[in-house]
């Protein structure tokens, strides 16, 4: 499974937790749920409003669900 190119962003402000993109760092422009196409699924992540323990300057987005494409 290939990670979307915008995961592991060079200037991230959010980290993805759970699901197939766990640990990926990305940049979001609005604090709203985001989706990523991964293989034959669309994975949805939602913001928690919390900072990450591993990356304390990044906001946490948690895996919500996946839907087939």
Feature-to-residue mapping (PLM):
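Domain-length accessory/inserted modules outside core catalytic folds
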Residues: 1-69
């Amino acid at each position: 499974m290939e990670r979307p190119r915008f995961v592991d962003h060079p200037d991230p402000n959010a980290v993805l937790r759970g699901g197939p993109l766990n640990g990926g760092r990305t940049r979001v422009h609005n604090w709203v749920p985001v989706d990523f196409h991964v293989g034959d699924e669309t994975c949805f992540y939602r913001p928690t409003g919390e900072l990450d323990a591993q990356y304390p300057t990044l906001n946490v987005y948690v895996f919500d669900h996946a839907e087939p494409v």
